[in-house]
Amino acid sequence: MKLLKLSLVAALAAGALATTASAVPLEEAIKDVDVSGFMRLRYTADEADKSVNNEKKKVSDAKWNIKSVIDFKAKVDDNFFAVAGVRYGNDGGATEYGYNSGNGNFGGGVYNNTADDQFDMYRAYIGYTVGNTTVQLGRQNVFSFFTDDMYGDGLFALNSDIQGLTLGALWMDALEQDGDISSNIDAIKVATGKRVTDHDLYGVGAIGSYDPVSFQLWYAYLNDVVGLFAVELGANFDVNDDVTVGLKGQYGFANFDNDFADTIGVDDSNFFGFEASANIDFFDMSAGYVNYSASDDESVSLSSFEDSGSFIKAGEELVDYALYEGKNDYWFVTAGVTIPDTGVRIGADYVDGSFGEDGDYDASEVVARIDYKYNEKLNFKTWYSYIDQDSGDDDNRFRFEAKYSF
């Protein structure tokens, strides 16, 4: 979408140009600038079993979350381009990390990753493209298998000279204090003098697609903390115009730096999982299994650095790869139906398995979902999650989300 379509932004640009000695016509200044972004409103309500003064009590909480993002991409010439993005977020304050639904804890603690209201320039980088190679320098998305939507300052390069194969490499030396990095807590800073986000991140990856087979191969190293590896192999088949089936398998491991592991008390881990999926006309379904475990059953570990990365996942709250204890294995099924000509999808997930030392505790999660796609720009999502655990720590969460993208 061209900047000309945004009257407010155009007015601001006009004001700035009016004060510049070398001002150029507004249409000339904005003709190669694209604008995109979104506005999102969330309401989340939680109820969980917590220990208060050595007694189990139901604790409830609810909060609103407002987030708005606007990105500007300017074409400098045939090779160079520049990107800047501003973001406003209200997330309700501190994020608490602790033992919950099989999650481990590197010593416990609360890390307030952001103020209640935050306005920042979350993206600002220069890019250069020549042939099938693009290099980007500055504040940008950390593009890797082990992260979801976090940002960092550094260098990212992408090449697609080989048909069907994309190669990537990154180096980041200033990582965003993202709330989904469960290991980014006060206890680690106290023990080592640094948060995990204060360490440099290096990564390489390969993504291939040769119909019907696709694959990914990734390695990332967080300096003096942990090395992460993941491989994925998948296949998708079109049986006919109305039926498609897919298969996907993944394996990964985490190898912690010895000094860091000894200081914090963490251990290496392994992950493997598979998923089968099918779409039949208006129906969709999937089934799969994931196993992620620390090498020492009494230790905590991780498979993903931020959120769930690109690992197979079902449900909403029970399965967590960013921080966990002991052995964890779950199987899952999902199903949904999209009502024709309405934009409405109704679905459900069921996850069942065990967690903890030697998988001592059984746990399950049921998720009910309703999505409504009003048009290409406006979407609504609602889901309810209920977790039942042998340990007696039952949790439920409700979320409503409205998102407008442009």
What residue spans do the PLM features occupy?
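Internal metal/ion-chelating core segments
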Residues: N159, L165-A235
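Structural signature of outer-membrane beta-barrel domains
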Residues: R42-D46, G89-G93, V142-S144, M172-Q177, ...
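Glycine/serine-rich loop-strand microenvironments at binding/catalytic pocket rims
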Residues: A23-F38, R42-K50, K56-K58, V204-Y219, ...
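Solvent-exposed loop segments that connect transmembrane elements
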Residues: D49-K58, G98-N112, A174-V196, A254-G265, ...
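Beta-barrel outer-membrane channel/assembly domains of diderm bacteria
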Residues: K2-R139, L155-S160, D211, L233-D241, ...
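Detector for outer-membrane/organellar transmembrane beta-barrel domains
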Residues: S209-P212, G234-G356
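Outer-membrane beta-barrel proteins
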Residues: K57-S60, Q140-M150, L222, G252-A254, ...
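Solvent-exposed loop/turn segments connecting transmembrane beta-strands
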Residues: Q118, V142-G154, D173-D178, V196-D200, ...
